[in-house]
């Protein structure tokens, strides 16, 4: 499932970040790697998705969230 599909207050784990090297560099620089656990804080349709991961609150734009495969934990 994509990150945009998880509801607020749900926990998940990053399953795959895709193969786009520019995208991989960007998301790994903010601490998101495969296997990273997180909690969805906010997921409104027109706003960035807010997640809490590695003791940090991150806002990820929706188009990037479509590239991130997750599994519910």
Language-model segments: residues:
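Short, charged beta-turn/beta-strand-edge "cap" motif at the junction between a beta-strand
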Residues: 1, 20, 42-47
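Short, conserved secondary-structure segments in the cores of folded domains
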Residues: 2, 26-28, 48
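Short, structured beta-strand/loop micro-motifs enriched in basic residues and often containing a Trp
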Residues: 10-23
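A residue-level detector for short acidic-glycine micro-motifs
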Residues: 5, 16, 40-42
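C-terminal structural segments of small proteins and small subunits
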Residues: 12, 43-73
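Short alpha-helix capping/helix-loop boundary micro-motifs
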Residues: 22-26, 36
């Amino acid at each position: 499932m994509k990150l945009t599909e998880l509801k607020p207050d749900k926990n998940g784990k990053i399953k795959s970040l895709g193969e786009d090297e520019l995208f991989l560099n960007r998301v790994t620089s903010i601490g998101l790697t495969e296997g990273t656990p997180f909690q969805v804080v906010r997921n409104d349709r027109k706003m960035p998705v807010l997640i809490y991961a590695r003791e940090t609150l991150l806002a990820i734009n929706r188009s990037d969230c479509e590239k991130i495969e997750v599994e519910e934990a």
